[in-house]
From Swiss-Prot:
Keywords (A to Z) from UniProt: ATP-binding, Coenzyme A biosynthesis, Cytoplasm, Magnesium, Nucleotide-binding, Nucleotidyltransferase, Transferase
Recorded name of the encoding gene: coaD
Function, in words: Reversibly transfers an adenylyl group from ATP to 4'-phosphopantetheine, yielding dephospho-CoA (dPCoA) and pyrophosphate.
CDD domains reported for this sequence: PPAT
Protein name: Phosphopantetheine adenylyltransferase
Binding site for ATP: 11-12, 19, 95-97, 105, 130-136
């Protein structure tokens, strides 16, 4: 049987329950899912690459048990299609929260298909309970001392609280 490999790219700064929702759905589509953390030299993320790897690994293990081992965390810079090819992925996962996401992601999928016709983009709609969550809003709420526990895994909530307590 051919192993289906997918790549789900993002900054994951921080990992949210919305990201976990997409990762869970991805496990139904692929045997192995790479959570690919985009590294952009011009951006200063709140969490380092190493911290984001650890948070993703901790959260997926806690949330998915043994299935969490099917999620691998990697870094990439440059084009996501190159990251997918490097990992041997034939599927690129994209989460959709709303129509705005769909419009943008359809444009990206079209461009990616032109450059890499062997890769299939799969859109996964977010569950209603996580559709409003964005990492940007989570960071803003955390920076103002708000309760971010409904929006992120427990390990991420602790790490965010510690970051902003300094």
């Amino acid at each position: 049987m051919i192993e289906r490999t997918a790549l789900y790219a993002g900054s994951f700064d921080p990992l949210t329950n919305g990201h976990l929702d997409v990762l869970k759905a991805s496990l139904a589509v692929a045997d192995i899912v790479y959570a690919a953390i985009g590294i952009h030299p011009g951006k200063k993320p709140l969490f380092s690459f190493e911290e984001r790897v650890q948070l993703i690994e901790d959260a997926t293990k806690a949330e998915f048990g043994r299935d969490g081992a099917r999620i691998k965390v990697v870094a990439f810079d440059g084009l996501v299609i190159d990251a997918a090819r490097k990992q041997g992925a034939s599927i690129m996962i994209r989460g959709l929260r709303d129509g705005t996401d769909l419009d943008y992601e359809m444009q990206m999928a079209g461009m990616n298909e032109t450059m890499a016709p062997e890769l299939q983009t799969v859109f996964l709609p977010a569950s209603p309970s996580v559709r409003t969550i964005t990492a940007t809003l989570v960071r803003q709420i955390a920076s103002m001392g708000g309760d971010i526990r409904p929006f992120v895994p427990a390990a991420v909530a602790g790490a965010l609280t510690a970051k902003f307590a300094k």
